[in-house]
Amino acid sequence: TLVNYLGGGDDAAGMARVNKFCQDHGYTSTSMGRLLLADNSKGDNYTSAKDCGKFLKTIYQIDKGTATDNNDTLAGAEYMYRLLKMQTRKNKIPAQMPSEVKVANKTGELDHVENDAGIIYDTAKGIDLVVCFMSQDLNDTAAAQNTIAQDSRAIYGYYNE
């Protein structure tokens, strides 16, 4: 896994490196306490829409060459942006966008959870956007997916129509 790679073959060292990066870059609502889907008796993983949005904004600005803060350096930002553009799950943020609008996003799904964070780009008026949706304790995940799609479309429309 990426965490194992970051830790030089040691998952705990990789998680520590992720947490240090988050602390050093002001992602104050993000922490990695365990590997994905591992028993959470030793810790939990959490983040916020604000931290996800900030991270995506940094990736976008570095890719566009518009980063203004000297702290806005992130090795591999351009590669991360390319990976986000390759997302195959289109049932949330991109679902109701006009066909010419592009979305680079990362979804997250668990039982009773539907998340999506993305960059809406190549828009009608050139106003690119970062949006992030996070949910938990859902009874109807299909309704949540539809709400994310509707809200994304409404946000796009507000700025670009």
Provide a role label for each language-model segment.
Residues 1-62:
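Mid-domain, small-residue-enriched loop/turn segments at the edges of structured enzyme/sensor domains
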Residues 7, 57-92, 96-161:
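Structured C-terminal helix/loop/strand segments within mature extracytoplasmic catalytic/sensor domains
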